[in-house]
Amino acid sequence: MTVTVRFAPSPTGYIHIGNTRTALSNWLYASKNNGKFILRYDDTDVERSKDEYAQAIAVDLDWLGVRPDRVEYQSKRFDIYAKAVEKLKTAGLLYACYETADELERRRKLRLARRLPPVYGREALKLTDAEKAALEAEGRKPHWRFLLPNFESDPFATQRTEVHWDDLVRGPQTVDLASMSDPILVREDGTYLYTLPSVVDDIDMGVTHIIRGDDHVTNTGVQISIFKALGATPPVFGHHNLLTTISGEGLSKRTGALSVGSLREAGYEPMAVASLAILIGTSESVTAAPDMAALAEHFDLASISKSSAKFDPSELDALNRSLLHEMPFEKAKPRLEALGICGAKAESFWLAVRGNLDRFSDVSDWWQVVSGDLPEAPDLSGEDRDFVRHAFDLLPPEPWNGQTWKSWTEAVKSATGRKGKNLFMPLRLALTGQAHGPELADLLVLVGLERTKSRRP
């Protein structure tokens, strides 16, 4: 059996880091099991689904390193769903209902008042053909419910009916179908809710494992029943915990700041986003994996906590810095060249500055420091200005190397009596225009004698 998984986003908005957790969990599970990954757009809501969102999702996944083996659109498969509807109708498992939302709400309140579970009472099953015709003559159109197998022979005599599965994340799970309403599969206008197309596609596409958020745990009992009603063996299920904001709020497509696109535009590395999305809320330590192969080594569905995990942007910042600070030159080289950073000193420059980067784009500012002019003259006090001028008069001739800074500052210390911060800070400001940054022993060689002299205040 070939392991086949799917990620099925609705292209009604941009995906966020919570969606990324689901996509990457499926991708890594397939990768570790030599399986297949299907990207399936749940675009049955044709009015809200937009091609621009579908394209954005594809771009976001590609940026993260997720490359589907197959791409499908549910909007192109309505004829397949129609056949499944007819099959369920013929089997007596899909029945027409005519209640309005207000009528259903009144019935729900009445059941609660009688201390009964607020589930649908299957009143529509009692309608005669004449009563249905009369309702349709009034202009009502039916919606269609799936008849859950929670009874022996009388659908009005429901009984405890347990559905069991061994969850890849949560272990043995049980759902009682008697506590649920028969789900609506087809709306009044003939469009489909999520449930039926999802099950039909999973069957048709040979999906063997469904990995998704634990907000779908209850749905699983219903979906297993539909799989069986359509004559299929249910796949293996795994439900990971959900990500929330620091304040505990659920993530949504309206949380724009946490969309994958916004994180990319903010300069985060894809592996920083991927590492946090996968490792947060697990028993694994949250560390930055340099690539997908390394992340796969730490990926284990069984290690995921059953409690929700809070997404802290500061953790993402820390992971991003870790990746940049340890990034080898060969990996950074193409990106440096794209920024015009190349030549004989590119490698030594990268090794000098990488430990001070929060974002890769910060590298351009440091390249300007070592190869261009400072944006503005450093703000030095009169005493510090005189000190720096004296120090610059003591600059040794080239060639310079890694020991030049030490020998120069020792000479300056002897000549001026300054030491520690009082010596180094004015020189740093004069050389770089910044109060903090890479080791000056490394930068001085990169700046060179002539450019250093040009910065004499």
Swiss-Prot record:
Catalysed reactions listed for this entry: tRNA(Glu) + L-glutamate + ATP = L-glutamyl-tRNA(Glu) + AMP + diphosphate
One function term, GO molecular function aspect: ATP binding
Residues that hold ATP according to the record: K253
One annotated GO biological process: glutamyl-tRNA aminoacylation
Subcellular location: Cytoplasm
Pfam families: Anticodon_2, tRNA-synt_1c
Keyword field: Aminoacyl-tRNA synthetase, ATP-binding, Cytoplasm, Ligase, Nucleotide-binding, Protein biosynthesis
Motif annotated as 'HIGH' region, chain positions: 9-19
Superkingdom of the organism of origin: Bacteria
Motif 'KMSKS' region: chain residues: 250-254
This protein's record includes keyword ATP-binding: yes
GO CC terms, sorted: cytoplasm
The keyword Ribonucleoprotein is annotated on this UniProt entry: no
Top-rank EC class of the record's enzyme: ligase
Record family assignment: Belongs to the class-I aminoacyl-tRNA synthetase family. Glutamate--tRNA ligase type 1 subfamily.
Assembly notes: Monomer.
Protein role: Catalyzes the attachment of glutamate to tRNA(Glu) in a two-step reaction: glutamate is first activated by ATP to form Glu-AMP and then transferred to the acceptor end of tRNA(Glu).
Name of the molecule in the record: Glutamate--tRNA ligase 1
